[in-house]
Curated annotation (Swiss-Prot):
PROSITE patterns: SSRP. Residues 134-160 are annotated as: Disordered. Belongs to the SmpB family. Keywords: Cytoplasm, RNA-binding. This is SsrA-binding protein. The keyword Disulfide bond does not apply. It comes from the Bacteria. GO terms for biological process: trans-translation. The keyword RNA-binding applies. InterPro entries: SmpB, SsrA-bd_prot, SsrA-bd_prot_CS.
Amino acid sequence: MAKQKKHPTGTIAQNKKARHDYFIEHRFEAGLVLAGWEVKSLRASKLQLVDSYVLLKDGEAWLLGSHITPLTTASTHVIADPVRTRKLLLNARELEKLAAAVQQKGYACICLSWYWSKHLVKCEIALGKGKKEYDKRDTERERDSNRELHRAVRNKGKED
């Protein structure tokens, strides 16, 4: 059996829906408290972040909604809970900044991606302000116009 290729950037999973639903304002890097079977599953990229978000409670940050699918070979002696709440490791200054921003109306703390930093798993979290439906349409329209512009510039030299 051939080994799977590792991700070139070290990215395990991304939450693309978060970039679509929120204006990202500030990003933070957080460590995670994980069990052994979770790390083995992450090496096999068995992670889903679609509806994950960060809950700030009692001066601590907790990640909810992330789903790690357990490997059948790795978690034989442990009862694996794929959607358990996981503690995020942030310093006190970052926690205060997040708590103050989330108190404001319209702001949410969301998980953008998980990645490897040397041998550690890190979580990129962000403060985001929710987009309205017309904001999403504007973003899509802007992306389409940029694509057309780049296509026109690229094809301009080929018309000779």
